[in-house]
UniProtKB/Swiss-Prot annotation:
Function per UniProt: Required for cytoplasm to vacuole transport (Cvt), pexophagy and mitophagy. Also involved in endoplasmic reticulum-specific autophagic process and is essential for the survival of cells subjected to severe ER stress. Functions in protein retrieval from the endocytic pathway.
Residues binding a 1,2-diacyl-sn-glycero-3-phospho-(1D-myo-inositol-3-phosphate): R319, S321, K345, R395
Record's compositionally biased regions (Polar residues): 60-76, 204-218
UniProt cross-references to SMART domains, sorted A to Z: PX
Biased composition (Basic and acidic residues): 17-29, 95-122, 129-138
GO biological process, one term: early endosome to Golgi transport
Lineage: Eukaryota, Fungi, Dikarya, Ascomycota, Saccharomycotina
Keyword Secreted: no
Keywords assigned by UniProt, alphabetized: Autophagy, Endosome, Lipid-binding, Membrane, Protein transport, Transport
Name the record gives this protein: Autophagy-related protein 20
Domain comment, as recorded: The PX domain binds phosphatidylinositol 3-phosphate which is necessary for peripheral membrane localization to the perivacuolar punctate structures.
Length: 753
């Protein structure tokens, strides 16, 4: 081993001296010329290459080889070719240097060729990685030589240095790609093509054995052929990277274009996505639930009740005024639709006064719920009194159904309004509404908005007259009055309005009477409690052993419990749905009133148009008459110059002074003659404007009649009748259940006798 080191040092000194001589001899060679091969240098390089396998000073050896070769392209290429051929001829197995392979990142292999690659990394690459510097070939810059490269060690390679440098680009490409072991979708039967796949086989021998099922000898021979082929056809590996970069850039542009197309498609299909909200919420069960209601005070302002809404896994806090604002916006955005109702704005104090006459007005929640709202899931704050709890539960019920009905509505859910309302990021709903440009553009009065699209209100709609809603419209429909036929009901509005009024009367009366029954049953329940307590006290005072009083006490207790269950069902499952039905009828009435006011609006426009036309005709006739009678002007002027007769004096000095002052004022006023032509021109412009307004209003009225009278109101009436049938069926079921239980209780008393 010592001999080998001495011979290596000697050869190193000899090679360095020869290299200096060769460098001095090549100074005058022009750039791009070829250098003749030096057999002595190649023989010494081969001998020195064999000694590299038994030494650790590899960095200095590579530098010596580069100094000997002089850095020219042809010398480096031939040196590498012979150096690789000598390594392949030896075909000796050497133990793998584990430390070197860990630094480079390659997998260990028993193949001699792969060991040579690892040694190449140890000699020339790993040492330079520590300094993080660039490896540059010493010599002249030859433009015709493709082997002269100056690149960074981290991911780039200088060509023509060693066998490891020759395969470095492919190794780097392998390490950055997904290997077969890492790819779960790899097809083992697919043929491997290209140098990249062969490089993957070199770095993953186990994977190559499983997929291609070849022995180690075949892989060794294949690797040797690959090294020889690459050494013969050496080219710049950076060109491959440039081609791949171009492909990546092209793919990036394609992906960007596809993303833009996808974004445009998503915007175009936003409405269809909103239409799927209804089916999505039903399948996923992501409906709105109000989980808590409690009093909240912000700063020094008065307290209010906040409702904590859970939707899609998030919690948002809203107050009653926020719900009221949301519904007012929906009424403006969808003027031809029945918007679900919300409870009337009623203070807690006023509601408490209204129910103050009821003894024990608090009702226990029933064991069963007839609709989708489960009030048992809503927590009422303990700071709320029993009298205030009823109105809070009432609001929780109606507001929950209000939001769920909005989500189930296809047209409303196609917009982002409901999602914005339920978004916890919009903590202050009032600020969100005032900062929205869409809401600020809406007209204050929906009678001056475009009924088809309120966000696209025209100048004609903005100038429409607003009827007075406080004035009674009378028995006759204004639209029928305009048509001139009171029996004309082509749209079915009169019959529809009568049907709605009949349904509204039934619901109101049913709610009023059932509320009275519920109140009486609630009082009867407390009477049963008093009777049970009286019989219990009587049984304690009875000297005899007669247990009849005890039986009466137990029976009245059971009847009280059954009555309490009945009262709870009647209040929450009958009275509350009936009250909600009244709210629904009010929403339909509001929609019918909108249709009627639009009819009055059209009537006013038509009436104003007819009056202006008559006035224009009168002026035109008067002008023609003046032209035919020229003396008429002199008569009018003489009449104008004639003194105004003095008014008859009234009795008393006070009235005489007033008359004198009035006469002086009349004499001082000069009567200016009107320009008939200007007046006619103004009337014609006004008539044109009214005709345009009449045409737009008539067209809107047709849309309103088709939507309200033929779709919305009939659908609402049909749903209301179905709800009323379900309510009455539940009412009969509750009464029947209570009657059966109460009958069994008293039958047991009769049998005991």
């Amino acid at each position: 081993m010592g001999r080998s080191k001495r011979s290596k040092k000697k050869s190193l000194a000899h090679l360095q001296s020869d290299g200096k001589d060769k460098l001095s001899s090549e100074e005058n060679i022009s750039r791009g010329s070829e250098v003749e091969e030096s057999p002595e240098n190649f023989e010494e390089a081969q001998d020195y290459g064999d000694s590299l396998k038994d030494t650790d000073e590899q960095s200095d050896s590579i530098t010596a080889i580069r100094s000997v070769t002089g850095g020219t392209a042809s010398t480096i290429t031939d040196l590498n070719n012979k150096f690789k051929s000598q390594e392949l001829v030896d075909n000796e197995k050497v133990e793998i240097n584990t430390k070197s392979t860990e630094e480079v990142g390659c997998k260990p292999s028993t193949d001699h060729s792969t060991e040579a690659l690892d040694e190449g990394h140890d000699t020339g690459i790993s040492s330079t990685n520590k300094d993080d510097s660039d490896v540059r070939i010493i010599g002249d810059d030859n433009e015709d030589s493709e082997a002269i490269e100056s690149v960074d060690i981290k991911g780039k390679v200088s060509s023509g240095i060693s066998d490891a440098d020759v395969l470095k680009p492919q190794e780097e490409l392998v390490h950055t790609a997904i290997l077969e072991n890492d790819n779960p979708f790899y097809d083992a039967n697919k043929e491997i093509s290209g140098s990249k796949k062969l490089d993957e086989k070199v770095n993953s021998v186990d994977s190559m054995a499983e997929t291609t099922k070849v022995n180690s000898g075949d892989s060794k021979q294949r690797m040797g052929d690959l090294v020889v082929r690459r050494s013969e056809n050496l080219h710049n590996p950076n060109l491959d990277y440039e081609e791949e970069d171009e492909i990546l850039v092209s793919n990036t542009d394609t992906n960007k274009h596809s993303k833009e197309s996808s974004s445009a498609l998503n915007n175009a299909n936003m409405k269809s996505f909103g239409n799927a909200v209804k089916s999505y919420t039903k399948k996923s069960g992501k409906h709105v639930r109000i989980l808590e209601a409690k009093k909240v005070s912000e700063g020094q302002s008065r307290t209010f009740v906040a409702y904590f809404i859970k939707y899609n896994g998030h919690m948002v806090r809203r107050r009653y005024s926020d719900f009221e604002s949301l519904r007012s916006i929906l009424v403006k955005l969808f003027p031809l639709m029945v918007i679900p109702p919300i409870p009337e704005k009623e203070g807690l104090k006023s509601y408490s006064k209204a129910i103050a006459g009821l003894k024990h007005a608090k009702y226990i929640l029933p064991s069963e719920q007839t609709d989708s709202v489960d009030l048992s899931l809503s927590i009422i704050d303990q700071s709320v009194s029993d009298k205030e709890e009823n109105i809070i539960r009432h609001r929780v019920r109606i507001l929950t159904k209000f939001l769920n009905r909005l989500l189930d509505n296809t047209d409303i859910s196609s917009t982002s309004l409901i999602e914005d309302f339920l978004n916890p990021n919009n903590s202050n709903w009032n600020d969100f509404v005032t900062s929205s440009a869409t809401f600020s553009m809406l007209p204050r009065n929906r009678l001056q908005a475009n009924p088809v699209d309120p966000t696209n209100t025209t100048r004609v709609h903005a100038c429409l007259p607003i009827p007075n809603t406080s004035v009674a419209l009378g028995k006759r429909d204004p639209e029928l009055f305009v048509s001139g036929n009171e029996n004309d009901d082509t749209d079915g509005y009169i019959l529809l309005e009568k049907e709605h009024k009949r349904y509204e009367s039934i619901v109101n009366n049913t709610y009023k009477y059932n509320r009275r029954i519920t109140k009486n049953f609630n009082e009867m329940k407390h009477d049963y409690d008093d009777l049970a307590a009286a019989f219990a006290e009587l049984s304690n005072l009875d000297i005899s052993s007669n247990p009849k009083h005890v039986d009466f006490c137990a029976t009245f207790d059971k009847s009280s419990i059954a009555m309490q269950a009945l009262v709870s069902n009647l209040y929450y499952n009958i009275d509350e749905p009936l009250n909600e039905a009244i709210y629904n009828t009010n929403a339909v009435t509001e929609l019918l009133m909108f249709r009627k006011l639009k009819a009055v609006q059209l009537y006013k426009v038509e009436k104003s148009l007819v009056g202006k036309v008559h006035e224009l005709q009168k002026l035109e006739k008067g002008e023609n008459k003046i032209e035919s009678e020229p003396n008429q002007e002199s008569l009018t002027s003489a009449r104008r110059l004639s003194p105004i007769p003095a008014p008859q004096k009234l009795g008393g000095s006070f009235f005489n002074k007033i008359s004198e002052i009035a006469n002086k004022v009349k004499e001082s006023v000069s009567y200016q003659e009107l320009d008939v032509e200007t007046q006619i021109s103004n009337l014609r412009k006004e008539i044109e404007r009214l005709k345009e307004t009449s045409a737009v209003t008539t067209k809107d009225m047709e849309v309103i009649n088709d939507t309200i009278c033929k779709e919305e109101v009939p659908k609402a009436l049909k749903c209301g009748e179905k709800e009323l049938e379900d309510i009455l069926a539940s009412y009969a079921s509750y009464m029947k259940t209570y009657a059966k239980q109460n009958l069994e209780y008293w039958k047991s008393i009769q049998e005991a006798r």
